Design a protein with these regions (language model features):
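Juxtamembrane helix-loop-helix connectors linking adjacent transmembrane helices
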Residues: 12-24, 44-109, 119-125, 201-208
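Hydrophobic alpha-helical transmembrane segments
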Residues: 26, 61-65, 100, 130-135, ...
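Functionally important transmembrane alpha-helices
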Residues: 33, 149-209
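Aromatic-anchored segments of alpha-helical transmembrane domains
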Residues: 37-40, 137-146, 162-166, 189-190
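Small-polar-interrupted transmembrane alpha-helices in polytopic inner-membrane proteins
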Residues: 71-72, 103, 129-145, 158-161
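C-terminal ends of transmembrane helices
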Residues: 74-88, 140-150, 192-193
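Membrane-interface helix/loop boundary segments of multi-pass membrane proteins
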Residues: 90, 110-135, 169-175
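Active-site His/Glu-centered metal-binding helix of metallohydrolases
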Residues: 108-113, 117-118, 122, 142, ...
Length: 209
């Protein structure tokens, strides 16, 4: 890892990313993607129970992009000034690989599981949407500790989770995960990929290059 004060920059390549990505897909992404569908299949529930509806697509896209850009900036700043100065500068190919994963795989699956399944199931069991909101937000935040994220990082996740939940809660029923997924993807990419690029640019200016 490099820091703003390092004399050299450590790169992150496709090989480096793939080394952690494929076991993550097998051990985390696939189970989290399958379990929600098993739940609605067993209980004969519609896809809308999981937030799998289009909703008002133009509004969903506009909300997702506008809030997503703001959240990407927030995540980058949190990474730089709260979490710490350490970074690995991704290659162009690695940026594309990480971006694809965060936007099109990780964000949809995490939202399907937490805002879709956990929110829906707890609301169904308790009869109050507030418990669904609380359980899904808390579970989403704290599960990052399983990945050995620092508490400073988890704090940022918690704030982001509140935004994701509010976007979902504010919608008319049946709610759609589309806007939330877009915001989630931008936020994660800002924190874990684009943030590295910004930190590298700061390093470069600091070293007069």
């Amino acid at each position: 890892m490099s820091s703003i004060k390092s004399s050299e920059v450590v790169r992150s390549t496709i090989v480096d990313t793939w080394r952690w990505m494929w076991p993550d897909i097998l051990m985390r992404i696939l189970p989290m993607a399958v379990i929600p569908f098993l739940y609605i299949a067993i209980l004969h529930l519609p896809l809308a129970f999981l937030g799998l509806t289009w909703g008002d697509v133009p509004v969903q896209l506009a909300t997702g992009l506008l809030v997503g850009i703001c959240m990407a900036a927030f995540a980058t700043m949190w990474r730089m000034f709260i979490v710490g100065p350490w970074f690995r500068w991704p290659t162009i190919g690695d940026h594309f690989l990480q971006g694809f994963f965060y936007l099109f795989i990780n964000a949809p699956v995490e939202e399907l599981f937490f805002r879709g399944l956990v929110w829906g199931a707890v609301t169904q069991w308790t009869g109050w949407i507030g418990w669904g909101w609380l359980a899904s937000t808390a579970a989403y935040t704290l599960y990052h500790r399983l990945g050995k994220w620092s508490w400073r990082s988890v704090g940022g996740v918690g704030l982001a989770g509140l935004v994701f939940s509010l976007i979902y809660l504010a919608q008319p029923t049946p709610r759609s995960l589309l806007a939330v997924i877009i915001v989630h993807g931008f936020t994660t990419a800002g924190f874990l990929s684009w943030g590295d690029e910004v930190m590298y640019r700061r390093w470069k200016r600091g070293h007069g290059e």
